[in-house]
Amino acid sequence: MPEGARGLSLPKPSLRLGCGHQGEVCDCAAVSDTPTAQAATTMASPRGSGSSTSLSTVGSEGDPSPACSASRPEPLPEPPIRLHLLPVGIQGSVKPSRLERVAREIVETERAYVRDLRSIVEDYLGPLMDGRALGLNMEQVGTLFANIEDIYEFSSELLEDLEGCSSAGGIAECFVQRSEDFDIYTLYCMNYPSSLALLRELSVSPPATLWLQERQAQLRHSLPLQSFLLKPVQRILKYHLLLQELGKHWAEGPDSGGREMVEEAIVSMTAVAWYINDMKRKQEHAARLQEVQRRLGGWTGPELSAFGELVLEGTFRGGGGGGPRLRGGERLLFLFSRMLLVAKRRGPEYTYKGHIFCCNLSVSETPRDPLGFKVSDLTIPKHRHLFQAKNQEEKRLWIHCLQRLFFENHPASIPAKAKQVLLENSLHCAPKSKHIPEPPTSPLDSPRPRDAPGFTPGRRNPAPSPRLSGSRRGRRQSEPAKEAYVIFPQNDKPQVKHAGSEGELHPSSELQPVSASGLPEDLEDAGPPTLDPSGTSITEEILELLNQRGLRDSGPATHDIPKFPRDSRVPVESEPLPFQSLPSRESSEEEEEEDLETDEREPSPLHVLEGLEGSSAAEIPCIPSLTDIPSEVPSLPEIPEAPCLPCLSDISGVFEVPCLSPTSTVPDIPSLATTPSFPCGSWLPGPLQEAAQPQATRRELLSGSNPGRLSESPSESREGQEDDTEGVSFSAVQREAGTSVQGFPEELEYRSCSEIRSAWQALEQGQLARPGFPEPLLILEDSDLRGGSTSGKTGMPHSERSASRVRELARLYSERIQQMQRAETRASTNAPRRRPRVLAQPQPSPCPPQEEAEPGALPAFGHVLVCELAFPLNCTQESVPLGPAVLVQAATPLCIQGDDLSGQNLNVSDLSKQGHLSSNSIPPPVPLPGQSNFQNIQVPSTSLLPKQEPPDVQVPTASTLPDTSQLQSQVPAATPSAGHRNCVEIQVQSTTSLPGQECQADTVALSKQEGHEDSQNPNKAPGAEQRDVSIDQGLAVVGGRPVSPLPVCTSSPDQQIPATTPLPLSTDFPDMEGPGALPLPTQEGRPDCSIPCNPLPSLSQDVQVPAVIPVSQLQGLTDTRATVPLSSHKQEDAPECLGPEPSLTDTPAPRLLSSLGQQNTTDGPVSAAAVPLTEQGCSQDLQGLITSPVQTTMELPKPRGLVSRVATSESLDLTPPHSPSLSTRQLLGPSAAALSRYLAASYISQSLARRQGPGGEGTVASQGHWSSSAPTSRAPSPPPQPQPPAPPARRLSYATTVSIQVGGGGRLRPAKAQVRLNHPALLAAPHPGAVGPSQGPGGS
């Protein structure tokens, strides 16, 4: 047994440690005869022995001797500190061990403390309550004393327990057992500032001052009431120090029984001290925040308190502008837990200069200035600020805090444990910069290092030491990672201890420095958080202890005491705001700086997209947190400067989904568990990361097995994904998506349309050099990979994930951090997401679409991973082919008539039924002769009718028919189950014949009609003539009635009638009038079908026959939009892509029809694009007609399998043309992520279509109401480089699938969606007539 323990157990010493004290009252008769003097001496000696320098405040008044205790007669009749631990007979002969002295001191100091509390309650509170003095009302009395009575009662009970302990271990146990009860101090500590303020007011009043002085004299107190009121604050912050002393002297070794209890007590009380200290700091910061709010001018946002607590504030040299030089003036930075506010001092006021939400924050160091760092907004590339700190400590502190808040505000895609590991990692790995040698310096001071010794206010320090800029760049950032908490610990604990023991909340020395550093203007700051210093020491001590014990993880406070804070999320609370204020120096340069800010801001390469608010991709590289985290990796530093990748950095995303925010709060969300993916290549979402990678890499990733995998079995991938999330190898995930797409489910956050578009645009602009677009562009929703989980299980939350899983992930992150080559940021969807503008009611059908892999790996020219976090929403799964926008709207997946690929659902075919025929799932496609291919359609390789494969074919996803049952249709509902269901589905882009066929639904009928096959053959028909009937609306309603434009296109595949033939058809359509009006012949309601497929020769003109037309019947034909754009020209490869627009087409459709009637319907690729068909003169008319809602139409030059997007549109409702929007909405449902995907897909497809068009003679002007998301101008992209005609074999396809499922507990699993575009055709030389029409607002 440790010597101390033995000594304490000795009966004579009456180790009831404090028995003696209370003993007087209790039982120590023997002690009573002992002279008080002896007691005093004994007490003094232990104290003098240095048992604890922090214990200097033992006396009730702080006097070394207990003499003043005389005033406390009743309860403590005898001198309060009378206790003798030495046998009376041998006083002085045996010296108490250090452990005994410490234990005794704990009890003695508690007795003195309780005595002081009683004096406050009985001698001050009592008289004031009686109204005998000062005339204070009850409210003022409550403010002055708070819950002092409760504290007195609690402390009296604690004292009794301590006095009843017979060993040091027993004392420790008392604290452990009552640790939770100490929270009563929280209220008192938070009220203390108010109490002090009231007391000061009273001191100004002569009567009050006189009464207080008289009272002090009567009580013979050496200290005023103010000092007594401070004692509870000091005491609560001293317990952990006393216990640390106890543990320090506890004998080490096998006999050290009870040590665990002591350590537990230390941890518990340290946590209490930290918590109270933190609460106190928060209160002070809240007061400061109010002050800032009052003085801040030019701020038009909500109350600053809405952005969380004020974590740090400081004064820096610098300002806006991304130029290489620091421009003049001084900037005040106020770091809130959710936002960084930049202001400028103007006299006593602050002028608002800008703000950046923490979720969009990017921090990077400036290589040329060792003290400089740049803060930028990922969503607004031009919004950058360059600052110069006063010293290294301040810089490190700020960078660390900024990084930490970035992670904390990140969309919860990173588990809390992983975030912690990342930050800790950076802290531990970060080598201290040369300046840092003063590591001990408390970060507090550093921020204020008001006077960092070498710092000259105006000095720029332009030449950064190479060392610093290089390695530090990445690491430095992490260094600060010590976290405020850690930093605090760095403050000298001795200082803290002394301060605490002496009763000064804030060691004056520390406070002074801080305040000094702060300018008077920051008077608010001047008051250092009284607790900060102590907090620091506490943290430091805890860390020390935990490190020694190896408890670091469990210990409440290790360096990371922050853990507590972390969990509590006390953002850097540990850092006292005090750092904040730095001397202000106004500079005449300020104005200059301001002027330059604008100029220097570099325009975002993506700024062109008016809709992209957040195309801040450029800034992505700078994401501080990411870069920092990897800071260990020297290369990271470079990252910040990496060119802006179009990556989805636009976190801002176009939509803000309130519901998403909750996700962010859930660090543990299992889905997040996938975090392992993070380690993969970067923290960034796959897409970002990928974007960052050289294109080649991207290609390899995608073109390699990944594409194959993706295309081959989405379902498998999904399953795999689930597994991965479950803990399956993350590496696999990484490999798969190149960015661990699979692993991302959690991580994958919902990507805003703007992000995706930004990425795409960057690709388009050639930012990522790429040979052309020979490879398909894959936009995979995280679960694309796992396409198999049609069941939707994929989306189920992995709530069951255990903590061990979290730890594993954290470990993986830590290991990967050093491997990261790039740090990219992923958009924080969390932050301000915009609400999807027009989300329609979500489709209830939960059926997950089944996606089919397209045959063969697609060349990867680009791959963007789009992921969606689990939303608190309930969404239904939906699949939507993003066809021309119009189609999309119709939501009918065109999927190429063929059966759904997998025959999954013919739903589409049912489309006509619209009713979410998903259930319908029409019989598997009956491939028409020509169509048989359709089934394969999905597979690019599929023969697909020549063109037949509907563009949608594309895809697997295509299958999704948005409207259709949303999903499911997945496919191509195409299977025209009925004989021509295909047609319907068809869409058949291939329907070159389309022109002729044009009538979507008709087509279907057509399909039956002999022509179906033919249409299938459209390519055969060379379609050249066909141009794209695209009549998106195929059914356009003429005169408001659905008319199925059958562009007859006489050209049947073979016929190839030029389609010029105007369809008289139009007229027939009118009959259709109702969307459903025309009975579809066989169509089965495949309004979508749009299949232009059948260019039955005869049909051609005749086709227009209502019969075909019955399309209208398609009932949704109207809606249909069915763009069916057939590009006659060789549609073969027409990249259908184009048309993803949502297609408000509906409306246009009608117009279209009419015009069609006038002209060939055929031509009118109704798609809003109204792309002039080369051959079909009518296209122009159509164009006019169409208002473009249709956009989808695209003329694909020779797109062989013209996209049949068209069909898609039809869909749902037979509702009148207006319905389109409906379908669109349905598709999206409440899922903002799905919406953004659709919009992005629409944009991309339009972009591809534009590429197609030679000059795109007719750029589609039309845009859907979604247009905002898509660039308004549709200028045809630069004419596609002349390319050899698209390989006839290639077809253009595009489809998306979104699956959102509700898992147990009502939690949604991440939505999974897949969008694939095969645009090789685009590369092909655009058909002269072809135009890339569609641009429509993004699809759905």
Swiss-Prot record:
Domain PH: start-end pairs: 309-407
Keywords assigned: Guanine-nucleotide releasing factor, Phosphoprotein, Tumor suppressor
Pfam families the record matches: RhoGEF (PF00621), SOS1_NGEF_PH (PF22697)
Tissue specificity field: Expressed in thymus, skeletal muscle, lung, testis, uterus, pancreas and heart and also expressed during embryogenesis.
Extent of Low complexity compositional bias: 45-62, 1319-1333
Chain positions with Phosphothreonine modification: T441, T1215
Location of region: Disordered: 34-76, 431-623, 684-743, 820-855, 907-979, 991-1028, 1047-1069, 1125-1146, 1250-1340
Organism: Mus musculus (Mouse)
Function text: May be a transforming oncogene with exchange activity for CDC42. May be a guanine-nucleotide exchange factor (GEF) for RAC1 and CDC42. Activated by the binding to subunits beta and gamma of the heterotrimeric guanine nucleotide-binding protein (G protein). Involved in the regulation of actin polymerization.
Polar residues biased stretches: 34-44, 703-714, 820-831, 907-921, 930-945, 956-972, 1049-1059
Record domain DH: where: 98-279
Protein name: Pleckstrin homology domain-containing family G member 2
One GO BP: regulation of actin filament polymerization
Bias-annotated ranges (Acidic residues): 588-600
Annotated GO MF terms: guanyl-nucleotide exchange factor activity
Positions of post-translational Phosphoserine modification: S446, S465, S1219, S1269
InterPro entries xref list: DBL_dom_sf, DH_dom, PH-like_dom_sf, PH_domain, PH_PLEKHG1_G2_G3, SOS1_NGEF_PH
Biased composition (Basic and acidic residues): 560-572
Pro residues compositional bias, start-end: 1276-1288
Cysteine disulfide partners in this protein: none
